[in-house]
Amino acid sequence: MELGLALRLVAPPPRLPCRALQPPPMPCFSPCAARRSRIRSSRLERRVGVVVSGGSMASLAMEEEEEEEWEEAEEEAEGWQEEEAAVVTTRPRLELIEKPDRSLCLLDEYESEELGTSHCANHRSGYVAVLGKPNVGKSTLINQIVGQKLSIVTDKPQTTRHRILGICSEPEYQIILYDTPGVIKKEMHKLDTMMMKNVRSAVGSADCVLVVVDACKMPEKIDEILEEGVGNKDTELPVLLVLNKKDLIKPGEIAKKLEWYQKFTNADDVIPISAKFGHGVDDIKEWILSKLPLGPAYYPKDIASEHPERFFVGEIVREKIFLQYRQEIPYACQVNVISYKSRPTAKDFIQVEILVEKESQRSIILGKDGKAIKMLATASRLDIEDFLQKKVYLEIMVKVKENWRQDELLLKRYGYGGEIQAL
């Protein structure tokens, strides 16, 4: 699984047996449909060639005869001139697709249909940066909007380290959200500096900004968040203040805080929500769509993120570390997926490396007689299998790398502080 590949929401198609290669009856077949058939048949022929190579000559001759019949059916199909709209075909389903760019809007009609990027005249698409202090519910909100758990969520602050891209697509729009690390003013490590760089680069690519605040806490101006995240408290980007966790306070308190934020902040609008239960999320979508420009979808409509599967595997392990260990241990850990091998006839093999800064931290991760690391591996494996919808063999190693949070070159290697390349 290579970096830069986008993860699809759909499950991979089932493998077809050799007997399934007989062409179905074709009462009506257009040139575009024939083109799709040739693509599918060529792939299946390569797959069958591997299977038949170890079989008998009779089996091989039968397959060659089937191929000739298939080619004759294709040639016959070229003669049909029926309208494409009248043809019922099965769209090829790809498991992975390369990250698209702005040239998607220049694709021809057939290719746009195959990628699911065809759009109506009023189609809207754009980027949204989600900012806020640590532990205010940014990741929970994005998971609700996207409809799938992409960002890990714990009750500890600064759980999100990387800039997570989530994609919410419908026929009329595509919202691309950046989940950013919590905005912090005092940067303790080089890692903190790199994470804040991620925040600023996300805003630089955005069409609008959501600032999430905790309704349970005393009202505060968002100038500091905009200053640290945007670089300018008087940004010209549309800003929505999201008052999260309204389910934890009384209705009368919500009204007072709404009035305060509307009076003392520069936000264009204020919307109270409960990201945990999804209350108010539709209102946020409506506000975002009112700010996004008209344009085609930047990504295929059936993907939820541009990150590869191995990225989310590492995030799942890191989430379990946050949930299982306390104090400084989760913050001292860096999780790297160093090997990911897909095996069609066996469990996928995944090898994960956990880096810590001290030998004492390594001992805590391992636990007495290795009990703690076994518990971590089991919890991680179960969630990974649920995410991938397949069985995996997970191997976890724990190593000591002193002061890795202060090593800028190492942090860049781990994906921190990279600039966003907006499509």
UniProtKB/Swiss-Prot annotation:
Q: Where in the cell is it found?
A: Plastid, Chloroplast stroma, Chloroplast nucleoid
Listed binding positions for GTP are 132-139, 179-183, 244-247
**Segment annotated as transit peptide:** 1-60
**PROSITE patterns the record matches:** G_ERA, KH_TYPE_2
UniProt KW keywords = Chloroplast, GTP-binding, Nucleotide-binding, Plastid, Ribosome biogenesis, RNA-binding, Transit peptide
Give the residue ranges for region: G2: 158-162
| Residue stretches making up the KH type-2 domain | 325-402
Q: Does the keyword rRNA processing apply?
A: no
Spell out the InterPro entries in the cross-references. G_ERA_dom, GTP-bd, GTPase_Era-like, KH_dom-like_a/b, KH_dom_type_2, KH_sf_prok-type, P-loop_NTPase, Small_GTP-bd
Please give the residue ranges the record annotates as the region G5: 273-275
Q: Where is this region: G1?
A: 132-139
Q: What start and end residues bound the annotated signal peptide?
A: none
Instruction: Extract the ranges annotated as region (G4).
Output: 244-247
Q: Does the keyword Transit peptide apply?
A: yes
Domain Era-type G as annotated: residue spans: 124-294
G3: region residues: 179-182
Q: Which GO molecular function annotations are given, in alphabetical order?
A: GTP binding; mRNA binding; ribosomal small subunit binding; rRNA binding
What biological processes does GO assign it? ribosomal small subunit assembly; ribosome biogenesis; rRNA processing
Write down a Pfam family by its short name.
KH_2
- The UniProt entry lists the main location of this chain as plastid
Cite a GO CC annotation.
chloroplast nucleoid
Give the family, as the similarity comment puts it. Answer: Belongs to the TRAFAC class TrmE-Era-EngA-EngB-Septin-like GTPase superfamily. Era GTPase family.
Q: Which HAMAP family match?
A: GTPase_Era (MF_00367)
Q: Which NCBIfam families match?
A: era (TIGR00436), PRK00089.1 (NF000908), small_GTP (TIGR00231)
The record describes the protein's role as: Nuclear genome-encoded probable GTPase involved in ribosome biogenesis in chloroplasts. Plays a role in 16S rRNA maturation in plastids and may contribute to the assembly of the small (30S) ribosomal subunit.
**Protein's UniProt name:** GTPase ERA-like, chloroplastic
